[in-house]
From Swiss-Prot:
Alphabetized SMART domains for the sequence: Ribosomal_L2, Ribosomal_L2_C
Recorded family membership: Belongs to the universal ribosomal protein uL2 family.
Species of provenance: Prochlorococcus marinus (strain MIT 9515)
PROSITE patterns per record: RIBOSOMAL_L2
Name recorded for this polypeptide: Large ribosomal subunit protein uL2
Length: 287
């Protein structure tokens, strides 16, 4: 897989950089594994906006992805690599020996015709799912369960992988992509290897319209709003925000405020918190 740049025939193509989709082998999704999904467009059940800057976008059908990998010790062959409009990672379509078809997150380097399997004593190969307790130290893993049997909840984005650092008692230590080191129960399942399509981080949408196709609406800086719309608004010209620090539209501190609960039970499982990015290096927007 590689990235594709365009000649500047138009302002939109001047900055456009996309993946070349060379790894995609299937043109249409598996009919038995797609469902229609109502899009809330950032509204709750009363129609009130609870998440700003959401709406529009191209119609999508949701692909049912197997995050549990609960078909134990049954070989599956990779039949195709498909595009998924709901995530940056690709999907691998598996044909199991018993005739069932399932989607999984496509690991990096997986090929059509390759065999994958999940179980407690399966080969140490990329794409195979197994408990963390049987994986060798230093392994790169993805699609990690937080609770055994609940399905993968961590490390599912394109190009992501966690590293198995240590094993002690009933827990194993994982270094997550955020650099956080966290303890996970050893019986939790994970998939060997890293998620594919890592080149997505080098792409550029190129124009505002492609962002709208993804269902994202424009963001407006608070400093150019009226005082009734945002705490940063008002003033003559490019006036400062008039506060000790930036705040959200609802007056709460922004940029750097910790949002994790202090007494959360799982705090005992976090060995080392992720590194905090300074405000200067973050270069965040005026919310």
């Amino acid at each position: 897989m590689a990235i594709r740049k365009f000649k500047p025939y138009t302002p939109g193509t001047r900055q456009r950089v996309v993946t070349d989709f060379s790894e995609i082998t299937g043109s249409k999704p598996e009919r038995s594994l797609i469902v229609s999904k109502h899009r809330n467009k950032g509204r709750n059940n009363r129609g009130v906006i609870t998440c700003r800057h959401r709406g529009g976008g191209h119609k999508r059908q949701y692909r049912l992805v197997d995050f549990r990998r609960d078909k134990r010790n049954i070989n599956a062959k990779v039949a195709a690599i498909h595009y998924d409009p709901h995530r940056n990672a690709r999907l691998a379509l598996l044909f199991y020996e018993d005739g069932e078809k399932r989607y999984i997150i496509a690991p990096a380097g997986i090929k059509v015709g390759q065999n994958v399997i999940s179980g407690d004593s399966v080969p140490i190969e990329d794409g195979n799912a197994m408990p963390l307790s049987v994986m060798p130290l230093g392994s790169s893993v993805h699609c990690v369960e937080l609770y055994a049997g609940r399905g993968a909840q961590m490390v599912r984005s394109a190009g992501a992988s966690a590293q198995l650092m240590a094993k002690e008692g009933d827990y194993v230590a994982l270094k997550l992509p955020s650099t956080e080191v966290r303890l996970v129960r050893k019986e939790c399942y994970a998939t060997l290897g890293e998620v594919g399509n890592a080149e997505i981080r080098n792409t550029s949408l190129g124009k505002a319209g492609r962002t709208r196709w993804l269902g994202r609406r424009p963001q407006v800086r608070g400093s150019v709003m009226n005082p009734c719309d945002h705490p940063h608004g008002g003033g003559e010209g490019k006036a400062p925000i008039g506060r000790a620090g930036p705040v959200t539209p609802w007056g709460k501190a922004a940029l750097g405020l910790k949002t994790r609960k202090k007494n959360k039970p799982s705090n005992n499982l976090v060995v080392r918190r992720r590194r905090r990015i300074s405000k200067r290096s973050r270069g965040g927007r005026d919310s």
